[in-house]
């Protein structure tokens, strides 16, 4: 997850409160000092940190927690609300026909962001197109075209044309059937008159509905001055923070943007076109504190299911597993769906009670090992017969040896696959006996288990955030 170090540090501080029936002033002071240290290490502005810590301390000492709420959960709620306020609101971005222009300096990640945003809009049922107008950077056209192909979206660019305004004009005509047109522009080492003039000329031509500034998270609190400079020069409607997975300064960048008149539209991390998320303050902070994000999780599951079912000749329906026999084919489809959801550590962070504190306790390579096992299982199933995939119980010693020879995997891995299937089959049988009321109670228990194991009872539920926001 993005901002891993900050999240781990904040969760560790709050976990120190477990088991305490009441908090003294000294306890609160210690908590505030640890939160200050965590935020300063994330390059959050000193003044912002001081204001936030003062607010947390005042509320923790003066406000009375609801009956039945533990001191830890009450402080957790206060920290959650103050952090949501710190990072600000999300940029308004309706799912409708529009033209978006991206601006930013060299190396901020504009071209990658254009492809990621286009992919994101495509998952919402819209037809996006990328218009590449950068004629200055060598390779900009090729990179943009390649990433558009990865995102499976329309693309326009002209490597033989030197005038970015003409490319923009021609691009609008070529992509007139698109719902969302994303115009990528050139960058510079700094915001100079030449860049401002070029962006203004392109803006005058395309008349974008929204101008988004792309900022590298590594800028930390310096993002404030850059956002303010671009706002003063060309006007911006929102910000995209990129490369959050590669720096400890992401928290500073998020907080800095909120200090200006800007808001955040998207967060980018990773190298694939799917490594982008719409910035939702409540869900983002909820994950940061280890409380999960059911809204983001639901969206990922639905999208992954659609991708898994695309081109499926057997018309696989996961609900069938609750009614009949669970086969290795079903297990394989589940694995494909999990893979389509993205990195496992990100998925785990979205599940209340499984992310946060639990993830902190796992070895650094735990998710890589799990991903590797899933890949091995897939290779092993390629070497199985139709009968074995439909009925794994027929796989004995001789068949295991044959499967090992065909897949190149050790017998131990084949046995792991069969054991994993058996465990999942037993779990599904338990679900088969559940009524709707049982399922609802189970989901409620999961949500109340957020915060790395501490209950959230008596603190509200539903809505966007874990506290009913």
From Swiss-Prot:
Span of the signal peptide: none
GO terms of molecular function: 7S RNA binding; GTP binding; GTPase activity
Keywords in alphabetical order: Cytoplasm, GTP-binding, Hydrolase, Nucleotide-binding, Ribonucleoprotein, RNA-binding, Signal recognition particle
InterPro entries linked: P-loop_NTPase, Signal_recog_part_SRP54_M_sf, Signal_recog_particl_SRP54_hlx, Signal_recog_particle_SRP54_M, SRP/SRP_N, SRP54, SRP54_GTPase_dom, SRP54_N_sf
Documented EC number(s): 3.6.5.4
SUPFAM superfamilies: Domain of the SRP/SRP receptor G-proteins, P-loop containing nucleoside triphosphate hydrolases, Signal peptide-binding domain
Region of interest (Disordered), ranges: 388-410, 447-469
Enzyme class: hydrolase
Superkingdom of the source species: Archaea
Protein family according to the UniProt entry: Belongs to the GTP-binding SRP family. SRP54 subfamily.
Biological function: Involved in targeting and insertion of nascent membrane proteins into the cytoplasmic membrane. Binds to the hydrophobic signal sequence of the ribosome-nascent chain (RNC) as it emerges from the ribosomes. The SRP-RNC complex is then targeted to the cytoplasmic membrane where it interacts with the SRP receptor FtsY.
Protein name, as recorded: Signal recognition particle 54 kDa protein
Biological classification of the source: Archaea, Methanobacteriati, Methanobacteriota, Stenosarchaea group, Halobacteria
């Amino acid at each position: 997850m993005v901002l891993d170090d900050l999240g781990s540090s904040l969760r560790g501080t709050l976990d120190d409160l477990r088991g305490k029936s009441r908090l003294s002033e000294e306890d609160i002071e210690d908590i505030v000092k640890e939160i200050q240290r965590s935020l300063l290490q994330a390059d959050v502005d000193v003044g912002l940190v001081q204001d936030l810590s003062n607010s947390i301390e005042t509320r923790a000492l003066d406000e009375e927690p609801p009956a039945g709420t533990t001191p830890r959960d009450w402080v957790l709620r206060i920290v959650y609300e103050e952090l949501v306020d710190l990072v600000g609101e999300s940029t308004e971005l309706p799912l409708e026909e529009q033209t978006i222009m991206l601006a930013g300096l060299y190396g901020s990640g504009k071209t990658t962001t254009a492809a990621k945003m286009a992919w994101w809009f495509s998952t919402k049922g819209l037809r996006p197109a990328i218009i590449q107008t950068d004629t200055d950077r060598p390779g900009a056209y090729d990179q943009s075209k390649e990433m558009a192909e990865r995102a499976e979206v329309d693309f326009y660019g002209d490597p033989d044309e030197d005038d970015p305004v003409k490319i923009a004009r021609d691009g609008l005509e070529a992509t007139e059937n698109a719902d969302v047109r994303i115009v990528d522009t050139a960058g510079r080492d700094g915001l100079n008159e030449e860049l401002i003039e070029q962006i203004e000329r392109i803006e005058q031509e395309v008349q974008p509905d929204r101008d988004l500034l792309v900022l590298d998270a590594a800028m930390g609190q310096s993002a404030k001055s850059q956002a303010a400079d671009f706002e003063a020069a060309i006007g911006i409607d929102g910000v995209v923070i990129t490369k959050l997975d590669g720096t400890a300064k992401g928290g500073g960048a998020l907080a800095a943007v909120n200090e200006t008149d800007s808001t955040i539209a998207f967060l980018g991390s990773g190298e694939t076109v799917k490594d982008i998320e719409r910035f939702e303050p409540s869900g983002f902070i909820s994950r940061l504190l280890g409380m999960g994000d059911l809204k983001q999780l639901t969206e990922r599951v639905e999208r992954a299911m659609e991708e898994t079912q695309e081109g499926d000749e057997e018309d696989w329906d996961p609900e069938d597993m609750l009614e009949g026999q669970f086969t290795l084919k079903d297990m394989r489809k589940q694995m494909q769906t999990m893979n389509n959801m993205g990195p496992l550590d990100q998925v785990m962070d979205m599940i209340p009670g499984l992310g946060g504190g639990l993830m902190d306790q796992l070895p650094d390579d735990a998710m890589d090992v799990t991903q590797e096992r899933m890949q091995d299982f897939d290779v092993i199933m390629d070497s199985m017969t139709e009968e074995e995939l439909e009925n794994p119980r027929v796989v004995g010693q001789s068949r295991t040896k044959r499967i090992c020879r065909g897949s190149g995997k050790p017998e131990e891995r084949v046995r792991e696959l069969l054991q994993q299937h058996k465990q999942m089959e037993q779990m599904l049988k338990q679900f088969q006996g559940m009524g709707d009321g049982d399922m609802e109670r189970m989901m409620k228990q999961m949500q109340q288990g957020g915060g790395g194991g501490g209950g959230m009872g008596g603190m509200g539920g539903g809505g966007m955030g874990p506290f009913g926001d």
